[in-house]
Amino acid sequence: MHPLAFLEVYMIRVMVNGAGGKMGREVVKAVHNDPELTLVGGIDPTKAGQDVGSVAGIEQLGITMNASIDEVLGTNKPDVIVDFTNPAVIYENAKKMLSAGIHVVIGTTGLTAEQRDELDAIGRQN
């Protein structure tokens, strides 16, 4: 076994939702620069089809920006999605991601206590 093959197996696969926004672009850069993480995609309906790295202001990464969570769930399932979208969509998106067994890091404010409790329960079930 190649010595780096072991590392690739255990790298955390990360996708960024809201990857075209200010915070999302910073998360893309941070994930790209972390040797323990591998960036597998970005989601932003206004930047769909563009290279995730180019949108973030770094080199092209050969990773195409997706338009929606639904596109991702059927293709390139990450281990974790970091979400920097907005309160209008975060709750439904987080329910979809957690129900699909994807860990979620939410950087968006605006969830009610009841919504946070429900997301916690869904995450614990999956």
Give each language-model segment a name.
Residues V14-G18:
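Conserved N-terminal Rossmann-fold NAD(P)-binding element of oxidoreductases
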Residues L39, V104-V105:
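Hydrophobic beta-strand scaffold residues
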Residues D70-E71, N76-M97, G110-E114:
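Beta-loop-alpha module in the N-terminal Rossmann-like domain of NAD(P)-dependent dehydrogenases
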Residues T64-S68:
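Short acidic-hydrophobic, aromatic-tinged amphipathic segments that line or gate anion-handling sites
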Residues M1-Y10:
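Short, Lys/Arg-enriched N-terminal segments with co-localized hydrophobic residues
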Residues N33-I58:
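NAD(P)-binding Rossmann-fold cofactor-contacting core
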Residues G20, G24-V28:
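N-terminal Rossmann NAD(P)H-binding glycine-rich loop of SDR-like oxidoreductase domains
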Residues K95-A100, G107-N126:
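Rossmann-fold NAD(P)-binding glycine/threonine-rich loop
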